[in-house]
Regions:
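Two-component/phosphorelay signaling modules centered on CheY-like receiver
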Residues: 19-38
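Alpha4 helix (beta4-alpha4-beta5 surface) of REC/receiver domains from two-component response regulators
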Residues: 23-27, 71, 84, 95-110
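Short amphipathic alpha-helix used as the core "switch/output" element in two-component signaling
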Residues: 48, 70-83
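C-terminal output helix
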Residues: 98, 116-125, 129, 133
Length: 155
């Protein structure tokens, strides 16, 4: 399977309480070639949908009524298997440095502020998925015993 095909086959979970934001994210992702997109309009269902869908990438809005987006970010991050973490991209209208620091400290791999540039958004999504796929292959190679430090140049 080609690298681009593998990236486009990735499962993407989008969590946002705003239907317009879900529609925009799904439309941009579809235009970029992704077809396995699950949207979650009710953040209270996010954990259940995450466990059932087993995404390769999560796009998470932080500012949702009735739920602490940071707590959800932390919980999603803790659900990921330590040797196979699912990257989480935070989508937020909060441009403060405090919000960015807090999200990164809780495990977000990227932060995109709304409104976002669709071209940049597509590149960031592809980069995170490609990184996840590469780390997964590295992990599998390590389990198979094909990755060792012996290939390193002598220092």
């Amino acid at each position: 399977m080609s690298r681009m095909r593998a990236v486009c086959d990735a499962r993407i979970l989008v969590i946002d309480d705003e239907p317009a934001n879900l529609a925009l994210a799904a439309a941009v992702l579809s235009r970029e070639g992704y077809s396995n997109i699950e949207t979650v309009p009710d953040p209270r269902q996010a954990i259940e949908r995450y466990l059932a869908f087993r995404p390769d990438l999560v796009l998470l809005d932080l500012m949702m009524p009735g739920i602490d987006g940071y707590a959800l970010l932390d919980r999603l991050g803790r659900l990921a298997v330590a040797d196979d973490p699912v990257p989480i991209m935070v989508l937020t209208a909060d441009t403060s440095i405090e919000a960015r620091r807090r999200a990164l400290a809780l495990g977000a791999r990227d932060i995109v502020t709304k409104p976002f540039d669709v071209f940049e958004f597509g590149l960031r999504v592809a980069n995170l998925i490609e990184l996840r796929l590469l780390l997964g292959r590295l992990h599998q190679a390590g389990k198979a015993g094909t990755v060792t430090g012996e290939d390193s140049p002598a220092g």
